[in-house]
Regions:
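Protein kinase catalytic-loop region centered on the HRD/HxD motif
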Residues: 120-132
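Juxtacatalytic C-terminal regulatory tail of Ser/Thr protein kinases
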Residues: 260-335
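Protein kinase glycine-rich loop
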Residues: 16-22, 27
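Activation-segment/catalytic-loop signature of the eukaryotic protein kinase fold
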Residues: 79
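C-terminal lobe helix-coil module of Hanks-type protein kinase domains
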Residues: 177-280
Length: 338
């Protein structure tokens, strides 16, 4: 029997059930007797309590999320780094991972894929503006709630852009199918590495396939650095050309050729949403908005308002979910634990 189930941590958190586990931590559903709410508690494995690298990663997660406050990022409520037990108390998210949803659905309709992508990018924009790079964006780290809202989680290997030191373990870390080429080679990274990972997820949602697959992680990493992905329209011809361009632009090998920021990618998604027939021709379009140093919107605030006013993707999502809602009921999940 699990030694934590039935126990109360710090006289406050009643642990009810194990809902996830990985190489670094266990995640439990617990009830907060003070705030009268369900929470998720991530507890570091005892055998890792003396491992400085895992301790740093574990504590870094709470440190990173503590400076973030966004509806699309899992909240941290409390932390405890004692001698006997180390844990993080987080928002309890009852849903499934985006990876599970992709596996259930196969190819995802492009409007729905964009509905998810916009929320992910808004979360990353919030993090990047505060100097935090996630570095492990993948559908396993994205929670999907039944109403279609997205929660980005697992900032365990996030890095502050102003950090003075970066170990070799830091440089090469991430999930090989989604990491940027510069991550794969252990080079310097910035927020454009997260943009690349979003591009890979969008590719996977639209085509139902990962851009690079091989027998081992090293081979996939080499492909990330050297191979060109099959254009997603060759796999799914129903993908609009402009959306394919957005996807491939996010996945450029050279970080300097990607979207400069999450905000810029959001901007072009909005342009495409308003006119799904448009194409971007990123390779030779010299008057693109970010090349001019201007925006198609007067202010960032008005841009954000456009995203929030009447997002048509939500209607598409609700319609598509009507036939699949049962697959999410009872499939509660919370955070990836590594």
């Amino acid at each position: 029997m699990d030694k934590y189930i039935g126990k109360r941590l710090d006289g406050r958190y009643e642990i009810h059930e194990l809902i996830g586990q990985g190489g670094m931590a266990y995640v439990y559903r617990a009830y907060d007797r003070i705030e009268n709410r369900w929470v998720a508690i991530k507890i570091l494995r005892e055998e890792l309590s003396d491992n400085s690298d895992f301790l740093r990663r574990f504590r870094n997660e709470s440190k990173a999320i503590a400076v973030l406050s966004h509806p699309n990022i899992v909240k941290v409520y409390d932390v405890s780094f004692g001698d006997r037990i180390q844990y993080i108390v987080m928002e309890y998210v009852d849903g499934i991972t985006l990876k599970q949803y992709i596996e259930q659905q196969g190819e995802i309709k492009w409007r729905e894929a964009l509905y998810f992508t916009v929320q992910i990018l808004q979360a990353l924009q919030h993090a990047h503006e505060r100097g935090i790079i996630h570095r492990d964006i993948k559908p396993q780290n994205i929670m999907l709630l039944e109403d279609g809202s997205i929660k980005v989680m697992d900032f365990g290997i996030a890095r502050f852009t102003q950090a003075e030191t970066q170990t070799m373990t830091d440089k090469a870390i991430g999930s090989v199918h989604y990491i940027a080429p510069e991550q794969a080679r252990g080079g310097h990274i910035n927020d454009k590495a997260d943009i690349y990972s979003v591009g890979v997820m969008l590719y996977e949602m639209l085509s139902g396939q990962l851009p690079f697959v091989a027998d081992n992680a090293v081979s996939v990493a080499i492909m990330q650095m050297q191979a060109e992905p099959t254009p997603p329209t060759r796999i799914n011809p129903s993908i609009p050309k402009g959306l394919e361009e957005i996807t491939m632009h996010a996945m450029e090998k050279n970080p300097a050729q990607r979207f400069p920021s999450a905000a810029d990618m959001l901007e072009d998604i909005e342009r495409f949403r308003r006119n799904p027939e448009m194409v971007f021709n990123y390779g030779d379009q010299v008057d693109h908005a970010y090349a001019r140093g201007t925006s198609i919107y007067d202010t960032a605030g008005s841009r954000q308002q456009d995203y929030n006013d009447n997002y048509e993707y939500e209607e598409e999502y609700v319609r598509s979910r009507n036939g699949a809602k049962a697959s999410m009921v009872g499939a509660g999940n919370v955070a990836a634990v590594d």
